[in-house]
């Protein structure tokens, strides 16, 4: 037996997960198109989400559904299914009394217990809940996106957690005929009603009558796209879309019978489909408990997450790679934190970017040290338009960067596009269209009714599709050099970031109609501060610090060495940028993703410096 084979055999087993079988039908067409779908039927699901709340309020009224820290001592405030149902019914009655006539309920603030309850009440009143990115209110100077969305959906109700916090945003809007609801404090000069008052509304038979009228086609939510290609679009999320997608996710990775109840600690924003749908809905449908994490995977905000994980042992945990990197660093110094985190954990999920191999190894080393077992890393793929998850890695795999295989009920069409495939989707989880924008809706689908998502993929093994699909970036981001060489931006960007770890947070890839590839990178300030031993290092100082520049340069040189001979992968020049991505400039989506096109356009002057005949001292010349 070879040494490498022995090493593979010596690896501890993964903790048991009852994955759905990979029984995939593969249709290969004469033009090279491939269509994949599971032969296993999609399991049955509720007609609407309020039915799940009613079910658990009846069957397990005392079980905790939602929990969130609050108050001066940051203690857990918990709401059971029974309590939630009573409050939601009262809120539903209050909304019915307002005669909304199907107009949306917009929620401007972030995740909270009140946010969740109002969302369910809006659904019961048959008015779409429309959670808006708080960044559009709190981080924008001109509120252009907020005003655009407000005019697009014309909400009848606007809810927010704290009035004074949202004062500038509220006063930028025309609130004529709109009921404003505040949770904590009203906004001076803006008429509003308190959430607590609405939650005391006496319930009549109208509530049950309204719920009885909900159909699978009833619009439950309007979720906004991140605006990476212009102004955000309001994506219609029907009750069937959301219920079916929750069923898909639960079917491919079902909870072990007799195991712990679903317990999730999650920070992902509910205005985004991954947080509001993928994280939230399966917990509700399964009768589990969702702990709202007010922490974030960024410097100064991770401590809250660490505090929570010392007390909460999740059965399923999801984060972005940056969050896992910070968590790994904390757990490597804290055995008690490791024990709490891994105690009941069956799956670690990631999204937003490719998980670096070294980070995968660090997390598995911690899992093995703590439990004697490895914990599988899982990821899925989809979009706001697909409710969101359409594929997943529902098998034990050590490979990162996959998007998996289609769920039951989903068809994945792969259309040849150069050296990869353009991906398209059809299924019960796909939206019927965009709210108020029929012209854009018509452009969403191909001649067979498949949604054109704009992403690309390749097979792990062309001869064996069941091994899965690798994400290959956005079709629209790719470009050609003047040499005619095609550059795949998605994979190059993630590889460059990984090569320059830990000092780089994200990057823009330049080179369209140029002779070579250039890179504009944002520093990871937390890592840069640790590298140079200065906790007060600013962005402006970081991009000029010799140690940071040297680390950045070494990483890219190593990347280039690995890619020798491949001009589509070689980075010839690079520069670190001090100015963070701009939301108002459309560079940063509410998912935290970088809009390559908008970023390069906004920073055209920096791009010109990259390609100057005589580059200045800030440009790192690698070739």
Give a label for each model feature.
Residues 77-82, 211-213, 220-247:
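Conserved AMP-binding A3 loop
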Residues 1-96, 113, 119, 125, ...:
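N-lobe entry segment of adenylate-forming
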Residues 286-288, 306, 315-319, 328-402, ...:
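Gly/Ser/Thr-rich phosphate-binding loop
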């Amino acid at each position: 037996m070879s040494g490498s084979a022995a090493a593979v055999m010596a690896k501890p087993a993964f903790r048991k997960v009852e994955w759905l079988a990979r029984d995939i039908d593969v249709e290969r067409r004469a033009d090279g198109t491939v269509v994949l779908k599971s032969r296993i039927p999609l399991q049955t699901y509720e007609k609407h989400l309020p039915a799940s709340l009613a079910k658990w309020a009846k069957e397990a009224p005392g079980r905790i559904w939602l929990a969130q820290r609050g108050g001066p001592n940051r203690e857990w405030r918990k709401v059971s299914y029974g309590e939630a149902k009573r409050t939601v019914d009262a809120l539903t009655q209050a909304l019915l009394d307002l005669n909304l006539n199907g107009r949306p309920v917009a929620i401007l603030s972030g995740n909270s217990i009140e946010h969740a309850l109002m969302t369910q009440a809006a659904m019961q009143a048959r008015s779409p809940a429309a959670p808006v990115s708080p960044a559009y209110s709190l981080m924008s100077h001109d509120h252009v996106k907020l005003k655009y969305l407000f005019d697009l959906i014309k909400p009848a109700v606007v809810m927010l957690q704290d009035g004074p916090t949202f004062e500038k945003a509220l006063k930028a809007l025309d609130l004529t005929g709109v009921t404003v609801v505040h949770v904590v404090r009203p906004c001076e000069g803006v008429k509003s009603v308190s959430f607590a008052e609405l939650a005391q509304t006496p319930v009549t038979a109208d509530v049950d009558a309204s719920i009885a009228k909900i159909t699978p086609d009833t619009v439950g939510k309007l979720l906004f796209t991140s605006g990476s290609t212009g102004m955000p679009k309001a994506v219609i999320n029907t009750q069937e879309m959301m219920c079916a997608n929750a069923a898909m996710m639960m079917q491919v990775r079902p909870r072990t019978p007799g195991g712990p109840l679903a317990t999730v600690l999650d920070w992902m924003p509910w205005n985004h489909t991954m947080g509001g749908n993928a994280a939230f809905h399966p917990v509700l449908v399964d009768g589990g408990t969702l702990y709202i994490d007010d922490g974030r995977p960024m410097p100064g905000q991770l401590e809250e997450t660490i505090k929570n994980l010392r007390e909460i042992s999740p059965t399923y945990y999801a984060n972005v790679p940056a969050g896992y990197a910070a968590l790994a660093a904390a757990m490597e110094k804290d055995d008690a934190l490791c024990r709490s985190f891994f105690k009941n954990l069956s799956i670690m999920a990631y999204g937003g970017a490719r998980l670096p191999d070294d980070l995968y190894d660090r997390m598995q080393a911690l899992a093995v040290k703590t439990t004697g077992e490895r914990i599988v890393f899982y990821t899925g793929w989809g979009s706001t338009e697909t409710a969101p998850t359409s594929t997943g890695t529902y098998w034990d795999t050590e490979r990162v960067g996959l998007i998996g295989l289609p769920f039951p009920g989903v068809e994945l069409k792969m259309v040849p596009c150069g050296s990869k495939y353009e991906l398209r989707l059809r299924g019960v989880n796909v939206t019927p269209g965009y709210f108020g924008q029929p012209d854009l809706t018509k452009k969403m689908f191909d001649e067979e009714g498949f949604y054109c998502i704009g992403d690309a993929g390749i097979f792990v093994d062309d001869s064996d599709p069941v091994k899965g699909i690798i994400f290959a970036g956005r079709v629209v981001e790719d470009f050609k050099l003047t040499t005619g060489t095609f550059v795949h931006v998605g994979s190059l960007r993630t590889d460059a970031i990984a090569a320059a770890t830990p000092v780089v947070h994200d990057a823009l890839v330049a080179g369209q109609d140029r002779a070579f590839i250039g890179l504009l990178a944002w520093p990871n300030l937390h890592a840069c501060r640790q590298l140079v031993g200065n906790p007060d290092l600013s962005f402006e100082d970081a991009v000029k610090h010799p140690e940071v520049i040297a680390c950045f340069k070494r990483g890219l040189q190593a990347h280039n060495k690995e890619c020798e001979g491949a001009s589509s992968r070689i980075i010839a020049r690079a520069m670190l940028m001090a100015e963070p991505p701009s939301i108002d400039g459309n560079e940063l989506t509410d998912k935290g993703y970088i809009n390559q096109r908008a970023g390069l356009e906004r920073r055209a002057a920096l791009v010109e410096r990259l390609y100057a005949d005589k580059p200045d001292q800030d440009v790192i010349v690698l070739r």
